[in-house]
UniProtKB/Swiss-Prot annotation:
The organism of origin for this protein: Cereibacter sphaeroides (strain KD131 / KCTC 12085) (Rhodobacter sphaeroides)
EC numbers, comma separated: 1.2.1.8
Oligomer and partners: Dimer of dimers.
GO BP term, pick one: glycine betaine biosynthetic process from choline
Primary gene name: betB
Name this protein carries in UniProt: Betaine aldehyde dehydrogenase
Amino acid sequence: MRAQPAASHFVDGRPLEDETGAPIPVIYPATGEEIARLHEATPAVIEAALASGARAQAAWAAMRPVERARILRRASDLIRARNEELSLLETLDTGKPLQETLVADWASGADALEFFAGLAPAVTGETVPLGQDFVYTIREPLGLCVGIGAWNYPSQIACWKAAPALALGNAMVFKPSEVTPLGALKLAEILIEAGLPPGLFNVVQGRGGVGAALVTDSRVAKVSLTGSVPTGRRVYAAAAEGVRHVTMELGGKSPLIVFDDADLESAIGAAMLGNFYSAGQICSNGTRVFVQKGIKEAFLARLAERADAIRMGDPLDPEVQMGPLVSQAQLEKVLAYIEKARAEGGRLVCGGEASVSPGCYVQPTVFADVTDAMTLACEEVFGPVMAVLDFETEEEAIARANATDFGLAAGVFTADLTRAHRVVAQLQAGTCWINAYNLTPVEAPFGGVKLSGVGRENGRAAVEHYTQVKSVYVGMGPVDAPY
């Protein structure tokens, strides 16, 4: 098969196979072709991964941060040197077009490794003077971490979790989504080639049962999940049993607010990026596009024109701009949401159909006249389906934007920067953009509020979530006791 890896798992520095585990077929969503067949981790594989990680972590934590940094920097350089072949694998694994994977997936992963390599030697404690006594603090690694990935950005997510964990002295056992399991294996190989000691980044494959076994193991100190809200609830509850640290990057139903003084072409471009990039399969997408009434019809007319021009087709064609959804199951889910939007009274502006057979393709779709109570405005679709809602006043837009249980992201388009900052200050979202959308540089924290998650990925903020603080009180004089 065209993308068959050496083995299903990567444990203690080498590929590991156990064919007694349940099979995991890997399907290229553009054609339905099976491109690899892996096997789910058995209890023996899970134990080997956890044991080797726990065993290797102490020596890694004792290493000088600058030495850890050199290894991660080498891994970043290797990824960049092999970006083309890695991007091809990402396209086969996910169905995303090469036009995207060449610039957005492994490239971001390399950025994360490089950023945290640079940050690691600068992580220090503080001194608190107390007269002649004083306290100093030490930032220590948590220990053995578990990372659980999603299927939309599998390799980027693996890097976003591995980079801070490893840079700060932890070990990680990573379980990718069973839908897109290939990229994490490549990352494990590259880290070993770069000089990472065996056991510090292990990859095990599997479905929810494997994740549950990892999360509930007593040796695990931290769980970082990217996934849906229902999955997040289960993982959070399981982690709570052991009072483990958690980072949860979950779903969203994010608002993108377009005021009537906005640059129309830029706002439309952002709305398209926030709904159609990666075939709409991005957690931070601005799927509720609030457009001020005075410009709504002009916005819709130009949006339809640009959406109809999107080139769909074979993701391996470098000219193709939009590929298929990740699976047949996801295709059926998205088409059901489209039919529900029709039935509930949404006005179809463009798209609305499956496209480019065979494969899991859906046309870029826009519904107008959507109301806050419609399913399309309330639930995460995870497909190329945009809901356009109109509003009259700033206060109305803010109130309706916040009327959701989600809080991952939000965007504002306006020429009035005073208004932009005023609006953003009131939006209940962890990540916001002004006159931009879905740009997520690794230098900046990323994460949500409300049901969209806890904790932050990336930026200096990630240090807080992969370390713990030890306080040391130093007494400089005699100890007085009252007895």
